[in-house]
């Protein structure tokens, strides 16, 4: 914009955006792969392409004669049109990269955009006044901080609502997002009857959410082995109750995000209990983050938990039973790892954490039923899933929670051959993604 005035040329927003993008990419061509670059360019492109048209549409529909009302509505229309324009390209990018779509973004921008605008000028003023006289700059900075605190409090308040965002890991939500995109394209082409399009979009969202939330209620049980990279996080559901076995992965953020997004996507906003098999990071590094995000009942583990497991412990509800077996009393953390047997009705699913062959032998001696599913111990390491366990339990299917191209070489080929010899169907999170077992 400034350069156009200097060289006496007409300012053209799309050309200016293209020039800015060109300058950035000339300096660093790899910036095109940066999410922040894509979101910034996409948001500005959406504002330039659509916001003015949306603003004109609102203004033509209703614009009062009273001066004060006109100013208020001009601000409202401006905030709405900028938010809608920026969302055209930013929402698909967020869905693609983060797997979620914010439903409070529109309201947050409407209530908080003014504070951000004033805070920007307040920061500049604070710097200038501070350069002249520091105490005066501090006063301006304090007043500016009130705006920022308001905005942060607003975001925290709105994001606490259960439907603050929807997650594309749910197929109905992903289909709704595609349907909404098609509706938007049709509306931008015809520019007629926006209420009909908005209503259709809202109705489709309600149907998608209802389908996502109600589907698990029609199942006797569900076991979900989340794809958390090199780690483990398993969700056990039955009879309206939800338990989590471990919450760890390649990073704590990834495992906590995966657990929360999955549970929210199916309408679960509270975990009845969390069982931490042992304190290795790839099994627990997301537990603290998840605890801070959603209410969790009792935690079970071998250290620093509500319930310390030193002997066989049973959790019984409806026709389900969760049995927690203690590990060996001495040795490494892996050898002390808890094992969890989930028995919804006549089914049996065993999770052995990082238990070793010696610990598995102790489990077999304690008494195990034939298994429908085995969540393979230690991500498929050759220190676990021994002959004794497999011959005693005869699992029909083995699930391996493992990260792609991990540096440990998991799962070990010896273990895969052993499972094949016992006729187990093998599913892996590095190949199949999140694995859901329903019954």
Regions found by a protein language model. Give the residues of each.
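Hydrophobic alpha-helical transmembrane segments in multi-pass membrane proteins
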Residues: 1-106, 122, 168-218, 387, ...
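Core dinuclear metal-dependent hydrolase active-site scaffold
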Residues: 6, 16, 23-33, 37, ...
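Residue-level signal for inorganic ion chemistry
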Residues: 36, 90, 147, 299, ...
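Membrane-interface amphipathic/re-entrant loop segments adjacent to transmembrane helices
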Residues: 95-111, 121-179, 184
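Stable alpha-helical elements in mature extracytoplasmic
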Residues: 121, 255, 259, 267, ...
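Di-metal (Zn2+ and/or Mg2+/Mn2+) metal-binding site signature of metallo-dependent hydrolases
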Residues: 269-294, 376-388
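Short internal beta-strands
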Residues: 272-275, 297-303, 399-403
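Cap/insert and terminal regions of metallo-dependent hydrolase folds
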Residues: 362-434
């Amino acid at each position: 914009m400034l350069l156009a005035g200097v060289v006496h040329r007409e300012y053209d927003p799309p050309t200016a955006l293209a020039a800015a993008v060109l300058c950035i990419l000339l300096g660093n061509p790899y910036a095109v792969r940066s999410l922040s670059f894509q979101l910034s360019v996409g948001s500005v492109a959406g504002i330039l392409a659509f916001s003015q048209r949306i603003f004109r549409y609102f203004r033509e529909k209703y614009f009062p004669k009273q001066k004060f009302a006109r100013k208020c509505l001009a601000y409202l229309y401006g905030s709405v049109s900028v938010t809608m324009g920026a969302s055209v390209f930013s929402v698909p990018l967020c869905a693609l990269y983060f797997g979620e779509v914010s439903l409070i973004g529109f309201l947050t921008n409407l209530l908080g955009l003014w504070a951000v605008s004033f805070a920007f000028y307040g920061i500049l003023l604070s710097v200038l006044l501070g350069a002249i006289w520091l105490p005066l700059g501090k006063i301006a900075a304090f007043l500016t901080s009130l705006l920022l605190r308001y905005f942060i409090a607003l975001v925290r308040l709105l994001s606490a609502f259960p439907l603050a965002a929807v997650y594309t890991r749910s197929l109905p939500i992903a289909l709704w997002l595609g349907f909404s995109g098609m509706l938007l394209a049709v509306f931008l082409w015809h520019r007629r009857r926006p209420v009909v399009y908005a209503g259709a979009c809202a109705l489709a969202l309600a149907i998608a959410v209802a389908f996502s939330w109600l589907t698990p209620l029609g199942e006797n049980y569900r076991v979900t082995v989340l794809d958390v990279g090199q780690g483990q996080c398993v969700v056990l559901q039955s009879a309206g109750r939800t338990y989590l076995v471990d919450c760890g992965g390649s990073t704590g953020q990834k495992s906590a995000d995966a657990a929360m997004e999955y549970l929210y996507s199916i309408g679960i906003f509270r975990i009845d209990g969390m069982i931490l098999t042992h304190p290795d990071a790839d099994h627990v590094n997301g537990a603290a983050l998840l605890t801070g995000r959603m209410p969790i009942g009792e935690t079970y583990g071998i250290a620093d938990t509500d319930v310390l497991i030193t002997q066989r412990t049973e959790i019984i509800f409806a026709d389900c039973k969760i049995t927690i077996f203690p590990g060996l009393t001495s040795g490494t953390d892996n050898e002390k790892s808890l094992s969890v047997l989930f028995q919804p009705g006549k089914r049996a699913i065993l999770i052995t954490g990082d238990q070793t062959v010696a610990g598995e032998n102790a489990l077999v001696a304690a008494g195990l039923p034939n298994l429908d599913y085995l969540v393979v111990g230690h991500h498929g390491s050759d220190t676990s899933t021994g002959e004794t366990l497999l011959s005693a339990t005869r699992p029909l299917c083995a699930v391996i929670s493992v990260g792609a191209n991990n540096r440990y070489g998991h799962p070990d080929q010896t273990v895969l051959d052993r499972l094949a010899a016992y006729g187990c169907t093998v599913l892996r999170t590095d190949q199949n993604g999140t694995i859901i077992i329903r019954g």
